[in-house]
């Protein structure tokens, strides 16, 4: 899916958009089904090998939506600053579109290791032990980036 950006003067390059995704701590996963409508959920993630990955429980709302319609979007908001005197906001954000699928085996283990490196870099060994304990109780979902876009406003 590719949705054109109306304000071309605020459009970021793909490299700038990927930089926001790389630096972000959390993003919003957006999904939709005919039966339930739209559903957005904040979660942490890693960007690795041209895909967004997130972890979740074996069962739950996210998995129910993805099983019904795996076409999703994922948005990360980077730096923001309210500009009270200008009645506006400086911001940067990036969004990707893709099809969510579950990964298993060594790819799953490597992605979980990427989570430890990103969110707990001072606890790698403990993180590996945690991965081993929770491996079978965790799903890893991959969203290969089919399209990326980003916008920013800087005064």
What would you call each of these model-derived segments?
Residues 14, 59-60:
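Structural motif corresponding to alpha-helix initiation and N-cap regions
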Residues 21, 65-66, 115:
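A generic structural signal for nonpolar/aromatic side chains embedded in well-ordered alpha-helices
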Residues 61-89:
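Helix-adjacent hinge/juxtasegments
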Residues 1-23:
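Extreme N-terminal tail/first-helix region
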Residues 1-8, 81-155:
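Charged, gly/pro-rich active-site loop segments
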Residues 18, 44, 64, 86, ...:
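Short secondary-structure boundary/capping segments
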Residues 24-58, 74-75:
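Short beta-strand segments
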Residues 22-24, 37-38, 87, 136:
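Short solvent-exposed loop/turn micro-motifs enriched in small/polar/acidic residues
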């Amino acid at each position: 899916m590719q949705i054109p950006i109306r304000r071309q003067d605020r459009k970021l390059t793909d490299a700038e958009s990927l930089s926001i995704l790389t630096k972000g701590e959390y993003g919003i996963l957006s999904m939709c089904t005919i039966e339930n409508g739209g559903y957005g959920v904040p979660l942490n993630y890693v960007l690795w090998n041209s895909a967004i990955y997130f972890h979740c429980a074996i069962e739950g709302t996210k998995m129910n939506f993805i099983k019904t319609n795996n076409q999703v979007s994922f948005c990360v908001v980077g730096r923001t600053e309210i500009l009270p005197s200008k009645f506006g906001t400086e911001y940067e954000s990036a969004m990707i579109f893709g099809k969510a699928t579950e990964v298993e085996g060594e790819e799953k283990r490597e992605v979980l290791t990427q989570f430890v490196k990103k969110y707990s870099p001072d606890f790698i060994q403990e993180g590996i032990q945690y991965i081993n304990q929770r491996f079978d109780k965790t799903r890893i979902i991959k969203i290969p980036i089919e399209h990326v876009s980003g916008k920013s406003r800087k005064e």
